[in-house]
């Protein structure tokens, strides 16, 4: 039986969620739908959808303050900040200071139990520290990403403005639904535009 789509497949595609890169890592091979004539790898949005459902259930089990979401990429700053505001998670955008997760004597030290990284390549310092302290890592992974140490892969275009907004909007909505904060999607009062970076 086909899994329920959180938004229509066309919506994922319209937002560019499926647009990968021209380089593919062997780790991401299972999530590639096809390769376009121009050499661009296309991601399978059904798998994106499926992983978002799993991530929503998983994250709903954590206390909001125990969830950390990080992003180095500028287009992800607003989606990540909005996601944190809506779910009660903690967000770190921009530079990730070394020791944030590993050095309790630092004033910016954070004690968390799960981390969401926007791009394993850009957010490498956060990844290293999460591995060191042994917390689960959920990562938005594009066609070119290596997925070593990633516990839950969400295959997606992790560079596009609209795709990042859609992914964080859906993830926030899924968490609230699984927590019981909202009982139906109609009660989720935010739009994708609320999550999208401004130009």
UniProtKB/Swiss-Prot annotation:
Q: Which organism is it from?
A: Thermoplasma acidophilum (strain ATCC 25905 / DSM 1728 / JCM 9062 / NBRC 15155 / AMRC-C165)
Sequence similarity: Belongs to the universal ribosomal protein uS2 family.
Query: Which GO BP annotation is one of this protein's?
Result: translation
Keywords annotated in UniProt = Ribonucleoprotein, Ribosomal protein
Q: Which Pfam families match?
A: Ribosomal_S2
Name the PANTHER family on file: 40S RIBOSOMAL PROTEIN SA
Q: Does the keyword Ribonucleoprotein apply?
A: yes
Is Ribosomal protein a UniProt keyword of this protein? Answer: yes
Task: Tell me a GO cellular component.
Answer: small ribosomal subunit
Q: What is this protein called?
A: Small ribosomal subunit protein uS2
GO molecular function annotation: structural constituent of ribosome
């Amino acid at each position: 039986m086909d899994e329920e789509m959180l938004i229509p497949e066309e919506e994922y595609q319209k937002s560019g969620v499926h647009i990968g890169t021209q380089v593919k890592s062997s780790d991401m091979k299972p999530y590639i739908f096809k390769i376009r004539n121009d050499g661009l790898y296309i991601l399978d949005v059904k798998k994106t959808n499926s992983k978002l459902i799993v991530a929503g259930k998983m994250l709903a089990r954590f206390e909001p303050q125990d969830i950390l979401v990080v992003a180095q990429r500028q287009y992800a700053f607003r989606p990540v900040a909005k996601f944190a505001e809506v779910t009660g998670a903690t967000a770190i955008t921009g530079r990730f200071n070394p020791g944030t997760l590993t050095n309790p004597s630092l004033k910016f030290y954070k004690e968390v139990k799960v981390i969401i990284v926007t791009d394993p390549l850009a957010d490498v310092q956060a990844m290293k520290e999460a591995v060191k302290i042994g917390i689960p890592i959920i990562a938005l992974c594009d066609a070119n990403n290596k997925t070593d140490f990633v516990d839950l892969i969400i295959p997606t275009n992790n560079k596009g403005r609209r795709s990042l907004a859609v992914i964080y909007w859906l993830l926030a909505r899924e968490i609230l639904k699984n927590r019981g904060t909202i009982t139906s999607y109609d009660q989720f009062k935010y739009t994708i535009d609320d999550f999208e970076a401004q130009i």
